[in-house]
């Protein structure tokens, strides 16, 4: 993850909640910002989620299923 330069210059920090689906085939789809902190931070958080590698999908009764996740991504300057 790369802290956005504009956000760094303006000392912008915050927590972005990103919602996405892991499909039956293990790929990420439908990435969206569920709760915004700042447009620059939002864009970087969504970019990072879109770059996730293929994963093991969730299973119900041994069969792959789609599952929705919402995760927080913290941006803090030190």
Q: What are the functions of these language-model segments?
A:
Residues 2-9, 40, 46-78:
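Short, positively biased Gly/Pro-containing turn/loop motifs at secondary-structure boundaries
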Residues 7-39, 45-52:
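Short tight loops/turns at secondary-structure junctions
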